[in-house]
Amino acid sequence: ADGSDPASGEFLTEGGGVR
């Protein structure tokens, strides 16, 4: 869960991973 995946991101990043 780093943010490279919108469903698995813990933080809002360029990958779209939002908590």
Swiss-Prot record:
Conversion of fibrinogen to fibrin is triggered by thrombin, which cleaves fibrinopeptides A and B from alpha and beta chains, and thus exposes the N-terminal polymerization sites responsible for the formation of the soft clot. The soft clot is converted into the hard clot by factor XIIIA which catalyzes the epsilon-(gamma-glutamyl)lysine cross-linking between gamma chains (stronger) and between alpha chains (weaker) of different monomers. Forms F13A-mediated cross-links between a glutamine and the epsilon-amino group of a lysine residue, forming fibronectin-fibrinogen heteropolymers. One of its GO terms (biological process) is blood coagulation. GO terms for cellular component: extracellular region. It is found in: Secreted. Its main location: secreted. The keyword Secreted applies. Keywords: Adaptive immunity, Blood coagulation, Coiled coil, Disulfide bond, Hemostasis, Immunity, Innate immunity, Secreted. Heterohexamer; disulfide linked. Contains 2 sets of 3 non-identical chains (alpha, beta and gamma). The 2 heterotrimers are in head to head conformation with the N-termini in a small central domain. A long coiled coil structure formed by 3 polypeptide chains connects the central nodule to the C-terminal domains (distal nodules). The long C-terminal ends of the alpha chains fold back, contributing a fourth strand to the coiled coil structure. Cleaved by the protease thrombin to yield monomers which, together with fibrinogen beta (FGB) and fibrinogen gamma (FGG), polymerize to form an insoluble fibrin matrix. Fibrin has a major function in hemostasis as one of the primary components of blood clots. In addition, functions during the early stages of wound repair to stabilize the lesion and guide cell migration during re-epithelialization. Was originally thought to be essential for platelet aggregation, based on in vitro studies using anticoagulated blood. This is Fibrinogen alpha chain. It comes from Muntiacus muntjak. The gene is FGA.
